[in-house]
């Protein structure tokens, strides 16, 4: 039976990836800080991987939040993800992992793009609001590429759109746009508040993917894709923040109005 370690296996995406792998018959070891494994500690992670001896390592761990959180904690986000990525690639090499599957955010694309196509990944800088998160994740790809050249490390790098679904975060600061909108609108309905403030113009278009679909796509790519060049997972269809807010308002049964703060960045 093929053994797989899922880093961040207690988190939103990682827990669903672990579930999807189990359904396909893999022997799955889901690890995270909750299970006593800090993946940013190279020596401890290497020792764990050498003990479990997995064939495949799926990296879903990250220190991540929404735009407001990125603005509040840029140093911690940058340093934590840089150390995490470095430790994961080094440990994968030292433990003799046969395949590293790295999950990438789509904020690693140039910030001025409306459509994300793999050949455009290196065509410009990331948006400043996500730079401290996106840059360490992009550096992980470079590190993995270097280790392929020197040590023969095999890795794939899958770029995902924004995710939603069971086990998501819904606090106003740490969550991404969809989770934050749900939190604000449901809270407004419960408090009988007549308006909700939304950052940006509402015109920004974002692609969304149900987390269980993302997990199935990751498993399929793990089985079928073997190129270090990035691969997008998604439908290629987007939805504006304004449209999204309207759908949530209707489903929540709230009849208030939205106040868009154009002085803030679009979510």
List each language-model region with its residue ranges.
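C-terminal substrate-binding subdomain of Rossmann-fold SDR/epimerase-dehydratase oxidoreductases
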Residues: 16-23, 187-267
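NAD(P)H-binding glycine-rich loop region in Rossmannoid oxidoreductase-like domains
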Residues: 42-81, 94
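N-terminal Rossmann NAD(P)H-binding glycine-rich loop of SDR-like oxidoreductase domains
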Residues: 2-24
